A protein has these predicted regions:
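Short, small-residue-biased leader/transition segments that mark boundaries at the very start
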Residues: 1-16, 580
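Short Gly/Thr/Asp-enriched flexible loops that form oxyanion-binding sites at enzyme active sites
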Residues: 257-270
Length: 580
């Protein structure tokens, strides 16, 4: 079980062993400090010949546990003696799987490949299956094994044989991939989307199968679905579940970036991905392909170029000028996305982006300052937009959408701007033949509109706009993906008399040496939603609940009845004010 946590948390280092990305020069210091990297330093120490007694003296970890880790480290050395996957005998392969080695890790130690390793992973998988080495499916017993319990709470293991359940083969079933561990960038918003997709599938008579591993989520409550696989959201494990269940298809567009990143891999293995084609997902996620598509459609965007060499990028920067934005592909929450103001920052951030997005291109684009950012959340069917929501950021562009204060419906954009945004969004939806949820982010200055990016999945603002609009976008999207009937809204559904404000909460005060300056990478850990009949009224309690309170008082200019009404709200929230 010690092998799963690093993989499940999507930690940058998914094995216990040394790599080019992680190496400790002062091992004694790392071992003596209880950090999140200490387990990796223990593995390195064992590989370098440290005894269990010495590691125990430095870490104070019980020798029994250290001995179990030593077994894993020693087995890595055994796997490294083979040069071909086909040479691994059945007993060695089975023991490796019992010890928690993934197909990815076995391929790495035997073949020492480079790149995304998809081909090598599949070679290990094929060899393993040819020897009949498959994971068993067991029920999680929620009552301390006092007696057998017939729950649908499942996990996979190689330590035993046999299956505790019968599979839904040839039945009407669908797999929904969840959002994984809560962390900055992926939280309850995506879990809301996953739960609503599962509930909609059940309403339509489907057997719903959820794959997720976060015990804090609603989606991992086994009452939510017909079958819950409490297991990692890796390519290997998802294929294992699909091989056993043989569902009608897989929904990858409601769990955030993790499932979205699996779309093309599943497609290449002939797994039916429901909704928008994985080919279209790749055209949107791949920065180079998407920017080229916008140019082809004649849709305006900030000047851009693909990273080919540092010299060419610097030539591009000389033309457009600083600042520029470095943007890797297939990343969550703006990971390794940075604004560069000089050559030194450019070189450092390009290197960082290339490390995070090794398989896909990095794009450098002009960064436009003092512009408004606008979001278009929508659901489409066969390229036709069915329902949508246009919201605006209070902050200027450059603050991640997950950190920005969001106002819906947008209150301060020109009518011509809104019309242009809808036209562009319909063009993109048609070109990508979208069937399901999607989100497009725009820059606007005066009546000039430019596209930033498009995500062919539910965004973190889907719950927000669904609640404000009183239309469940995920239910509509799921019905479309399952070819089920749905209610198409009329134009009056988008003409509402209230305003929603979503503000972010941050944990800077609890994080040592945290930088409180907001940027293009996400930092917030929580969101607050309030409703009102004009923007200032909902905004005041929103600010109150984010703990951003004035130390003295708010200077309040009384101009109009709406300002007078705000004094009542200020008083009710305990916020002091003075008249001006």
């Amino acid at each position: 079980m010690i092998r799963r946590p690093p993989r499940s948390t999507l930690f940058p280092y998914t094995t216990l062993f040394q790599s080019d990305e992680l190496h400790f020069d002062d091992l004694d210091r790392e071992l003596s400090r209880p950090t999140d990297l200490r387990i990796f330093s223990i593995a390195q120490a064992m590989e370098e010949g440290y005894t269990i007694e010495r590691i125990h003296d430095l870490t104070k970890i019980d020798p029994w546990f250290l001995g179990k880790l030593k077994n894993i480290v020693d087995y890595k050395a055994k796997l490294s003696t083979y040069n071909k996957v086909e040479d691994i005998p059945a007993d060695v392969m089975r023991e490796a799987k019992i010890l928690g080695f993934s197909d990815f890790q076995i391929a790495r130690f035997v073949l020492n490949p480079t790149g995304n390793m998809e081909k090598e992973n599949l070679a290990v998988r094929a060899h393993r299956k040819s020897m009949g080495i498959l994971p068993a499916v067991k029920r999680i017993n929620t009552i301390a094994s006092e007696h057998p319990e017939l729950t649908n709470y499942l996990y996979m293991t190689y330590a035993v044989e046999g299956y505790d359940v019968n599979y839904y083969k040839n039945e009407k079933s669908v797999v929904v991939l969840g959002s994984g561990a809560y962390r900055i960038g992926s939280s309850v918003e995506f879990d809301w989307c996953s739960v609503n997709a599962v509930q909609t599938a059940r309403k339509l008579g489907y057997k719903s199968i959820m794959i997720n591993y976060n015990p804090e989520t609603v989606s991992t409550d086994y009452d939510m679905c017909d079958r819950l696989y409490f297991d990692e959201l890796s390519f290997e494990r998802v294929l294992d579940v699909i091989d056993l269940e043989q569902p009608r298809g897989v929904i990858v567009s409601v769990g955030g970036q993790i499932p979205n990143n699996l779309a093309m891999k599943l497609y290449r293995q002939s797994v039916p991905v429901l909704g928008t084609s994985p080919i279209s997902i790749d055209r949107a996620e791949n920065r180079n392909k998407f920017s080229a598509m916008l140019d082809q459609l004649g849709i305006d965007q900030p000047a851009w170029m693909e990273l080919t060499s540092l010299e060419e990028v610097k030539g591009f920067v000389e033309k457009v000028g600083y600042p520029v934005l470095v943007r890797p592909s297939y990343v969550l929450s703006g990971a390794a996305m940075n604004v560069c103001y000089d050559d030194e920052e450019l070189e450092n951030f390009l290197k960082m982006a290339a490390e995070v997005s090794k398989e896909y291109p990095v794009v450098v684009s002009q960064f436009l300052e003092n512009t408004k950012e606008i979001e278009f959340d929508a659901v489409a069917q066969n390229g036709e937009v069915v329902e949508y929501a246009i919201s605006e950021h209070v902050e200027f562009a450059g603050v991640h959408s997950g950190d920005a204060t969001l106002v819906f419906p947008a209150q301060k954009i020109y009518f011509a701007t809104a019309r242009r945004i809808k036209k562009i969004s319909r063009q993109i939806a048609k070109e990508l033949n979208i069937s399901g949820p999607f989100n497009i982010q725009f820059l606007a200055r005066n009546n000039e509109v430019k596209v930033i990016e498009c995500n062919l999945r539910a965004s973190r603002s889907f719950p927000f706009v669904s609640k404000v609009l009183k239309r469940n976008f995920i239910e509509t999207a799921t019905r479309i993906m399952l070819d089920a009937p749905y209610s198409r809204p009329d134009k009056s559904a988008f003409d509402i008399d209230w305003i929603g404000v979503k503000a972010s909460q941050f944990s800077f005060s609890r994080l040592h040496k945290a930088d409180p300056v907001l940027g293009v990478d996400m930092s917030s850990t929580r969101h607050i939603l309030t409703l009102g009949h004009n923007t200032p009224l909902p905004d005041i309690p929103t600010i109150h609940h984010t703990d951003v309170l004035p130390h003295q008082s708010i200077q309040h200019g009384l101009v109009g009845l709406d300002k007078l009404a705000q004094t009542v709200v200020l008083t009710s929230q305990g916020i002091p004010f003075i008249y001006a």
